[in-house]
């Protein structure tokens, strides 16, 4: 039978509930337990797929094609378990399900209300499909007191009574701010947060307290007394240099022991932390440094590229080097020469994006990388712009463009209207809804033998996650290949280009998919490991 850990947050947002949940999952896994992580998001969007990256951050795509919260990326990176569409739900999805049921008459004429209908829908989501797991960790988005989160709080309160005795534990993540004028850490914000949580009927078993310095024993006793929590269950969560230090730090503070003790599991099996200790050691003791320029459209909010950033760091871990990131807004290169910005970097990465804004800057970045022999990694939109650059400057197709930007006589990149998924043909139209209508999730690709990318993967058959509407037009394949750009990977049916590369370039690869979504600190993605290795070689030349 699965045991449930509910993680809530208080005082302020962005305290790191997702990292805390992921780290706890990793610690329980290290003890041999089977762990599942789920995220409950209070916003009214059905999913984050149509939300602005500069407002919500990255949209994390699962193998089965769900557009989910970026915290699911943390869950995957820390536990190695691939998430599914059933691991994330929003208020919007819950209400949509309920309204659909009401329209079908499933409620048999009953008045549909928050209690019991909304709360039951939430409870069903939390408890379904957990037969194969020992622990289910549920993160509740937002902060205690948010009006949007109230149905979720009520649902997890009810679950405390619905589930068998001793199978639900509540962890509350709070902030203990340091006041310089007083020269001390303050407990009052945490006290008020717990008081508000208790007013909702939820009594936390464990307090996970964020702080930028050691919490004195006297302050722990104070929190224990006023928050009605065992002193041993007041766990300090101190700031660390890397998020991959968090599992070790939480284990040192006894979080996993306290969770298991709250479930009555004593003595608990000892954790195997060697892999995490090796990662932490590699991060602390790099043997070199490389600088990677990220030429993007959403550089104002780094969370828009969360998985990408982490995948680059994973490449650094694989090569025992520190990865320094230079963020460049792509629009800059539409007005200025890229050379002063890019001459000193060791690699250029152009990530995914949508829309015409900044596209010419990305094209100019690709041209600089091609001509100057600087390692270039184009992902999704970054691959498309590299192909447009080749079409214009190598194949002489001056009007080469993407139909995403409007009508064009030379649609080197165009809207996909149909593609094969499994054994079924999927179709889309330009007039269709934006939400959930892209080519989403894991698709297979066939790599051309003897190409650089096939050598990196070590296999001609790969599966990677996609999120795009537009695709390089296969009708231009022969003209582009005659100019030196090799289409090194195609969809199994040979219709959709998946990867491109220049054989005469040290490292120039474009991919239509998002390899960053499958990279892990304990298992770096081969493309990122190879890209950073190429950047390391470049650093010796600059």
Swiss-Prot record:
Catalytic activity reported: UTP + L-glutamine + ATP + H2O = CTP + L-glutamate + ADP + phosphate + 2 H(+); L-glutamine + H2O = L-glutamate + NH4(+); UTP + NH4(+) + ATP = CTP + ADP + phosphate + 2 H(+)
Description of how the protein assembles with itself and partners: Homotetramer.
EC code: 6.3.4.2
PANTHER family given in the database record: CTP SYNTHASE, CTP SYNTHASE-RELATED
GO cellular component: cytosol
Domain of life: Bacteria
Regulation: Allosterically activated by GTP, when glutamine is the substrate; GTP has no effect on the reaction when ammonia is the substrate. The allosteric effector GTP functions by stabilizing the protein conformation that binds the tetrahedral intermediate(s) formed during glutamine hydrolysis. Inhibited by the product CTP, via allosteric rather than competitive inhibition.
CDD domains: CTPS_N (cd03113), GATase1_CTP_Synthase (cd01746)
Stretches the record annotates as Amidoligase domain: 1-265
Biochemical pathway: Pyrimidine metabolism; CTP biosynthesis via de novo pathway; CTP from UDP: step 2/2
Residues noted as binding L-glutamine in the record, renumbered to the chain: 353, 381-384, 404, 469
Example GO BP: 'de novo' CTP biosynthetic process
UniProt family annotation: Belongs to the CTP synthase family.
Residue span, Glutamine amidotransferase type-1 domain: 291-541
Residues annotated for UTP binding in this entry: 13, 186-191, 222
Keywords from the named record: ATP-binding, Glutamine amidotransferase, Ligase, Magnesium, Metal-binding, Nucleotide-binding, Pyrimidine biosynthesis
Further information: CTPSs have evolved a hybrid strategy for distinguishing between UTP and CTP. The overlapping regions of the product feedback inhibitory and substrate sites recognize a common feature in both compounds, the triphosphate moiety. To differentiate isosteric substrate and product pyrimidine rings, an additional pocket far from the expected kinase/ligase catalytic site, specifically recognizes the cytosine and ribose portions of the product inhibitor.
Protein's organism: Sinorhizobium medicae (strain WSM419) (Ensifer medicae)
Residues of the active site: 380 (nucleophile), 514, 516
UniProt name for this protein: CTP synthase
């Amino acid at each position: 039978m699965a045991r449930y850990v509910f993680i809530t947050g208080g005082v302020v947002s962005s305290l790191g509930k997702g990292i805390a949940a992921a780290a706890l999952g990793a610690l329980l896994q290290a003890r041999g337990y089977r762990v599942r992580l789920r995220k409950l998001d209070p916003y009214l969007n059905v999913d984050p797929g149509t939300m602005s990256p500069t407002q919500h951050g990255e949209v994390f795509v699962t193998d089965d094609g769900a557009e989910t919260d970026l915290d699911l990326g943390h869950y995957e990176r820390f536990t190695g378990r691939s998430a599914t569409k059933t691991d994330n739900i929003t208020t919007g999805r819950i209400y949509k399900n309920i309204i659909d049921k009401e329209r079908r008459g499933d409620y048999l004429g009953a008045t549909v209300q928050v209690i019991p209908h909304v709360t039951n829908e939430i409870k069903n989501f939390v408890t379904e499909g957990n037969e194969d797991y020992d622990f289910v960790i549920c993160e509740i988005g937002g902060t205690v007191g948010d009006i949007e989160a109230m149905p979720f709080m009520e649902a997890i309160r009810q679950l405390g009574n619905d589930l068998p005795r001793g199978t639900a534990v509540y962890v509350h993540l709070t902030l203990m701010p340091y006041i310089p004028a007083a020269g001390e850490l303050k407990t009052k914000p945490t006290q008020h947060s717990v008081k508000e949580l208790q007013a909702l009927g939820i009594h936390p078993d464990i307090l996970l307290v964020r702080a930028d310095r050691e919490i004195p024993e006297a302050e722990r006793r104070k929190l224990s007394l006023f928050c009605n929590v065992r002193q041993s269950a007041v766990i300090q969560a101190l700031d660390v240099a890397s998020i991959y230090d968090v599992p070790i730090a939480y284990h040192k503070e006894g979080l996993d022991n306290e969770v298991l003790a709250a479930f009555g599991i004593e003595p608990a099996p000892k954790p195997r932390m060697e892999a995490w200790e090796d990662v932490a050691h590699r991060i602390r003791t790099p043997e070199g440094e490389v600088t990677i320029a990220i030429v993007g459209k959403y550089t104002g909010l780094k969370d828009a590229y969360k998985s990408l950033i982490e995948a680059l760091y994973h490449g650094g871990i694989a090569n025992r080097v520190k990865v320094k990131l230079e963020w460049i807004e792509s629009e800059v290169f539409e007005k200025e020469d890229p050379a002063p910005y890019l001459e000193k970097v060791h690699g250029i990465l152009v990530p995914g994006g949508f829309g015409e804004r900044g596209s010419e800057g990305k094209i100019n970045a690709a041209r600089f990388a091609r001509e100057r022999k600087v390692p270039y990694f184009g992902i999704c939109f970054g691959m498309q712009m590299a192909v447009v650059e080749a079409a214009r400057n190598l194949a002489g197709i001056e009007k080469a463009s993407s139909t995403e930007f409007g009508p064009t006589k030379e649609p080197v990149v165009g809207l996909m209207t149909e593609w094969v998924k499994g054994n079924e043909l999927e179709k889309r139209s330009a007039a269709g809804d934006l939400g959930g209508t892209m080519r989403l999730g894991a698709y297979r690709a066939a790599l051309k033998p003897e190409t650089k990318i096939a050598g990196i993967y070590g296999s001609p058959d790969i599966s990677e996650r996609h999120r795009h509407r537009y695709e390089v037009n296969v009708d231009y394949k022969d003209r582009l290949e005659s100019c030196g750009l090799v289409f090194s990977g195609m969809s199994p049916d040979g219709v959709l280009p998946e990867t491109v590369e220049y054989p005469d370039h040290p490292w120039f690869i474009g991919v239509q998919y998002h390899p960053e979504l499958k990279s892990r600190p304990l298992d770096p993605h081969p493309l990122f490991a190879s890209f950073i290795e190429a950047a390391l070689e470049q650093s010796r030349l600059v």
